[in-house]
């Protein structure tokens, strides 16, 4: 049995807006996130974790930010592509774990909806997906509420 684990990390700065996209859920917030696509930091980190487990680079390899067709793109496109690569390579997703790092918005109340959204996009049962949050105890750029960071891990199995 081939077991693979990949890690992903992403960060986006706050900018103008009235919401952020996190793990496929529109979360009301007094600022938005700045990015080439919809800046869904959770989906970006998770997508990179999957590509890492497959040893297939990162989002930038598959969807170059220099390509204007990806400007403002929904991050579900990237995650769906990564899931397609899992299937094409004969793997299945065993588990994924997403940790959002921010002071605000508060993630806890939204985590169940984020798990459901990711499960629907990825075509897996919600029990294979963890979404949680932590703060940086007011330290660094997330502590100063300048942006949101995310780390994700994906474990893949091939029988």
From Swiss-Prot:
Associated pathway: Isoprenoid biosynthesis; isopentenyl diphosphate biosynthesis via DXP pathway; isopentenyl diphosphate from 1-deoxy-D-xylulose 5-phosphate: step 4/6
Cofactor note: Binds 1 divalent metal cation per subunit.
Name of this protein: 2-C-methyl-D-erythritol 2,4-cyclodiphosphate synthase
Residue positions binding a divalent metal cation: 10, 12, 44
UniProt catalytic activity: 4-CDP-2-C-methyl-D-erythritol 2-phosphate = 2-C-methyl-D-erythritol 2,4-cyclic diphosphate + CMP
Keyword annotations of the record: Isoprene biosynthesis, Lyase, Metal-binding
UniProt gene name: ispF
The EC number(s) this enzyme carries: 4.6.1.12
Family, per entry: Belongs to the IspF family.
Organism: Cereibacter sphaeroides (strain ATCC 17025 / ATH 2.4.3) (Rhodobacter sphaeroides)
């Amino acid at each position: 049995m081939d077991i693979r684990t990949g890690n992903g990390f992403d960060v986006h700065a706050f900018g103008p807006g009235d919401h952020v996209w996190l793990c496929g859920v529109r979360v009301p917030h007094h600022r938005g996130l700045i990015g080439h696509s919809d800046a869904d930091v959770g989906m970006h980190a998770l997508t990179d974790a999957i590509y890492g487990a497959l040893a297939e680079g990162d989002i930038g390899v598959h969807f170059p930010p220099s390509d204007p067709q990806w400007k403002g793109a929904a991050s579900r496109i990237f995650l769906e592509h990564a899931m397609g690569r899992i299937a094409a390579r004969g793997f299945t997703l065993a588990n994924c774990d997403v940790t959002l790092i921010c002071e605000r918005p508060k993630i806890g109340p939204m985590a169940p909806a984020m798990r459901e959204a990711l499960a629907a996009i990825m075509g897996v049962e919600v029990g294979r997906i963890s979404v949680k949050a932590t703060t940086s105890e007011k330290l660094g750029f997330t502590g100063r509420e300048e942006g949101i960071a995310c780390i994700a891990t994906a474990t893949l199995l091939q029988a």
